[in-house]
């Protein structure tokens, strides 16, 4: 864990149920978002402890348990919530994400593998999923962010949208295209899929997972290839490997416009 910052913590500030896991362990800051702190606990096979505002990790706990049931990841050990904070303790999935040099050094294979794993996820049965209305939740977040002028046009560079107003108008005209017919990761990016020598091991960071529109994952799959590899040249290859017959360009553009306000 040499690339992570080691932390000194006061165990007494954590819920008593976590003390045994935290005791005598090296703790590292593995956070990647301002919304939550993630601690890596270097003990046994490794644990991750996610800490965020009260009730904000409930959905991730539900979907983490569901993905374990579907053999798509490991479940959580404990989910604790009080008036001010949530704590979600999870086991580390053994392996590395797509950002490991083994994968980044072979971008064509990475692209194809990323698409194949997404198609595998999207073909799963979802009848007993606890989150069946991701599209409605997604659009609600868009409306909230639009109302406070929280926007970023970088997400529509490929879609000939030049202004915030154009993006919002497109959403208003096309939002009924979004479906709830596919099990999603919701944040399908290279850091969130764990592999062992190219073999799929599991999905992590499932706070946006649920049943929604496949084009959300397709959008983020194409985006992460550009962002993490540094070129957009694998975009078409990714869509081809996933299956062009299952891609609606209007819904893909709609998701891009939604992410302007994401």
From Swiss-Prot:
Instruction: Enumerate the catalysed reactions.
Output: kanamycin A + ATP = kanamycin 3'-phosphate + ADP + H(+)
Q: Where is the active site?
A: 187 (proton acceptor)
UniProt keyword annotations, A-Z: Antibiotic resistance, ATP-binding, Kinase, Nucleotide-binding, Transferase
Q: What class of enzyme is it?
A: transferase
InterPro entries for this protein: Aminoglycoside_PTrfase (IPR002575), Kan/Strep_kinase (IPR024165), Kinase-like_dom_sf (IPR011009)
**Segments passing through the bilayer:** none
Q: Which Pfam families match?
A: APH
CDD domains in the record = APH (cd05150)
EC number of the protein? 2.7.1.95
**Which GO biological-process labels does this protein carry?**
response to antibiotic
Q: Name one molecular function that GO assigns to this entry.
A: kanamycin kinase activity
Top-level taxon? Bacteria
Family designation: Belongs to the aminoglycoside phosphotransferase family.
* Protein's UniProt name: Probable aminoglycoside 3'-phosphotransferase
Gene name, per UniProt, is ymdC
């Amino acid at each position: 864990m040499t690339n992570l910052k080691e932390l000194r913590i006061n165990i007494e500030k954590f819920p008593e149920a976590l003390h045994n896991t935290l005791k005598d362990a090296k703790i590292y800051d593995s956070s990647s978002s301002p919304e939550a702190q993630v601690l890596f606990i270097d003990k046994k096979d490794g644990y991750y402890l996610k800490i965020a505002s009260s009730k904000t990790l409930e959905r991730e706990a539900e979907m983490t348990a569901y993905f374990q049931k579907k053999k798509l990841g490991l479940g959580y050990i404990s989910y604790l919530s009080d008036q001010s904070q949530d704590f979600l303790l999870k086991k580390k999935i053994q392996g590395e994400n797509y950002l490991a040099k083994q994968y980044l050094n072979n971008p064509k294979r990475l692209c194809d593998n990323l698409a194949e794993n997404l198609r595998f996820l999207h073909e799963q049965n979802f009848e007993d999923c606890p989150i069946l209305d991701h599209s409605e939740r997604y659009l609600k977040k868009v409306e909230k962010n639009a109302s406070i002028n929280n926007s970023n046009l970088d997400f529509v560079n490929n879609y000939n949208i030049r202004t915030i107003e154009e993006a919002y108008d497109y959403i208003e005209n096309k939002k009924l295209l979004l479906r709830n017919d596919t099990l999603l990761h919701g944040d399908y990016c290279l850091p969130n899929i764990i592999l062992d020598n190219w073999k799929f091991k599991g999905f992590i960071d499932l706070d946006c997972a649920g049943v929604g529109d496949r084009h959300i994952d397709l959008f983020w799959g194409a985006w992460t290839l550009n962002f993490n590899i540094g070129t957009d040249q694998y975009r078409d290859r990714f869509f081809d490997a996933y299956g062009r017959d299952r891609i609606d360009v209007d819904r893909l553009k709609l998701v891009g416009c939604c992410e302007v306000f994401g």
